[in-house]
Amino acid sequence: MRTGIIAQKIGMTSVFNDKGERIPLTLVKVDDCQVVGHKTLEKHGYNALVIGIKDKKISRVTKPMKQVFANAKISPKTKLKEFRISEGNFIDIAANLEVDHFMAGQFVDITATTIGKGFAGSMKRHNFRGLEASHGVSISHRSHGSTGQRQDPGKVFKGKKMAGHMGCNQVTIQNLKIFAVDRERKLIMIRGSIPGHKNSYLSIKDAVKKNSITV
């Protein structure tokens, strides 16, 4: 198991294949992605690499993190993330990770944070049908309806689907296929859509369920 990388979502576009079929693509950019540190089985109980992306002003870094970057002899990074690895897949600290870490036709898993939607009702958040439009229903047309039973149990169970904050959740989309890799522009083109708004950070790693490469 090798390390993944951190990338930044640029936006979406599309191309047409020889059959005239439209293929939606998401563009992600890998810029200034470096190895910041190691986590070893002897010292930390597991093997992992700490990866950082995009240079950050030194004035915006805390003193403890300044020492971390100083030990690695690299400039401070905006985003850090750990990736679990197997024993023989360590990469030197301060090494650069480029877009050619992956190749066209490869399947990857992408972890990102969904776009926040704020406070949302049950119909938008959970796809409830709502109540009737007439026949005794007034004011509560978009309500979720009953939320419990009676005096016993006398409470609303945890996890009940109700209105509340929607979005801003970390999700992983599996088995997305890499359409192309542009080393000159530092871009990876991925088929389909991925979570998150433009310029948000996401992590890309080898697919757990699909490791074969198809062109």
From Swiss-Prot:
Stretches for region Disordered: 136-161
Post-translational modification N5-methylglutamine, affected residues: 151
Entry annotated with the keyword Ribonucleoprotein: yes
Post-translational modification: Methylated by PrmB.
InterPro entries in the record: Ribosomal_uL3, Ribosomal_uL3_bac/org-type, Ribosomal_uL3_CS, Transl_B-barrel_sf
Signal peptide: none
GO molecular function: rRNA binding; structural constituent of ribosome
Alphabetically ordered keywords of this record: Methylation, Ribonucleoprotein, Ribosomal protein, RNA-binding, rRNA-binding
A GO CC term attached to the entry: ribonucleoprotein complex
SUPFAM superfamilies: Translation proteins (SSF50447)
Described function: One of the primary rRNA binding proteins, it binds directly near the 3'-end of the 23S rRNA, where it nucleates assembly of the 50S subunit.
SUBUNIT field: Part of the 50S ribosomal subunit. Forms a cluster with proteins L14 and L19.
Family, as annotated: Belongs to the universal ribosomal protein uL3 family.
Record-linked PANTHER family: 50S RIBOSOMAL PROTEIN L3, LARGE RIBOSOMAL SUBUNIT PROTEIN UL3C
Designated name of the protein: Large ribosomal subunit protein uL3
Species assigned in the record: Rickettsia akari (strain Hartford)
